Each structure stands twice: as C-alpha cells, then as structure tokens.
Amino acid sequence: MSYHLHISPETRFLRLPGSFLLDSGERLRDVEIAYRTWGALAPARDNAVVVCHALTGSADVDRWWGRLLGGERALDPATDFVIAANLLGSCYGTTGPASPRAPGGPPWGGDFPAITVRDQVRLQQRLLDALGVERVRLVVGGSLGGMVALEWALGDPGRVEALAVLSAPAGHGPWGIALSELGRRALALDPKFRGGHYPADDPPEAGLALARAIAMTSYRSRPGFEQRFGRDRRDGRFEVVRYLEHQGRKLVDRFDANSYLALTRAMDTHDVARGRGEYAEVLAGVDVPALVVASH
C-alpha cells in the first residue's frame, strides 16, 4: 500500500542535515519532516500555533479539525501561523518504518528504532527553528497529540505562551499500556506480519484491524458505549460489534502496521515526571495558561 496517496499535495517536506539524536541514544540519519502551514509568520516571529495530531493522524489539520480552522475560528490563518507536522514514526511523510533505511534501500520495517514523545517535541523544535519561529502562541493537541503538547510546555518552556491539552494524561498509565500491548500482540500474531518485514502490497490487515478494535474500546467510557449502542442489533449482529469491525477496516485502508506499533510504544513512554521529579511539582512548573479537556 502506498501511504503517500493519503498525503495532501499541499504538504511540505524538510530534510534535516546530519543526524537526529533519539532519547534512546540512537541516531537517525536523513530524517524528513512532513508538515503543513496556514497563514504567515508575523515580522515579530511570535504568532505560531503548533497543532499536534493524534495516533493515526497526519499534518492535514483541515481534514480532521476543519471546523476549528479558518477565518474567525480557533485557528485563524488571518492572525495565526498554524503549523502541523506529521509525527516521527508515522506513515504520512515524516520518517517512519515505511521509509527507506538508506537512500534507495528497503524500508526500516520492524527494525525502526524506538521513539518517545519527547523525541517528537525535539523534532518539531527543529522544524520551527528552520521556519524561523521564535515564540509559539499556542500548542494544542489531542490524545497522543495532547501528550506531545504537554511535553512542549515542559521541554521548551521559554518558547510556549499557552497550552491546550485534549484527552491526554500526564503519564500513560498501566491500563492504557495494557490495552496497547494487547493490540500489539494481536497484530504480531497475524501470519502476514512477518516480524515487521511484510511487503507493502500484503500487509497484516487482520492483525491491524483487531488492534484498532481493541483500542476503540478505550476511546469511549462504559456509559458512552451504553448510550450509543445499548444492546441494539442489526441483521442479527450487535451494533457495537459492527462499529468495532468498521473502525478496524477503515484503519487498514490508510495506515501502516509498523507505524501503529512505533507510535503506540511511543505513547507508553509518556511520563512528564520521568527524570524531573514528582507529578505535582512537575505540573506546577507549567507556568503558562493551560486548557485541559477530558473526554467521556
């Protein structure tokens, strides 16, 4: 499958010179960042808004947060320089498992190095440096993007003026890690997975669909499932089962299994207290206006 078919023609690319140092100590060479922008950078270089996408998202904010983007909306290109970068490890243009390990060579596949949420912030910092951004008026993101947004405020506090974190914790807890691990194991059990070295035209679709279905059970609360689905049936099958199958099918048509593994493992690393102290004191150190929104 060519994931580039899902990358909008407006996407731009930045190739970093030299190598990019990961949290793990490994270095990635020839890292490319796929990104999009709306609006223009002000002469004072202080009107940037960084938008961080969720697990299987892309830099195309207009596709998934289109209602927030536009004139007199939350993300207004008339006043804001809106920047969105595809996350490291994804399959929508930024370097990831589907990228060549070396120019002209085979893809990384299952050998792609481990990445963290903090790696995402450092990579986005490199992008903003290249774009000439000095101050960030707002960093906003949901789910995995919310984790990245929170790390922005801690990893580059002098640059960020405000923060909006949607449906993201200060640390990815054991329940979330357990569900992600179940999904990863389901994916790996697909015979087509082949240790992460599957051909692009024959990916482990069944495993990825099941991993997605497992994850979807955590994207709503139990009352949310009761309210939406109840015990309703259609054609003899429970609506909730049809919903899970539908979500799985949708993902396999557009996302890479190895990217799913890489990014869920990155989520597992999210812990603002790691190497910084206790949660309360670390979060108290975020001294910019912050909007935190929980989901139900």
Predicted features along the sequence, with ranges:
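N-terminal cap/lid subdomain of alpha/beta-hydrolase-fold enzymes
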Residues: 36-102
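Cap/lid segment of the alpha/beta-hydrolase catalytic domain
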Residues: 73-128, 177, 181-195
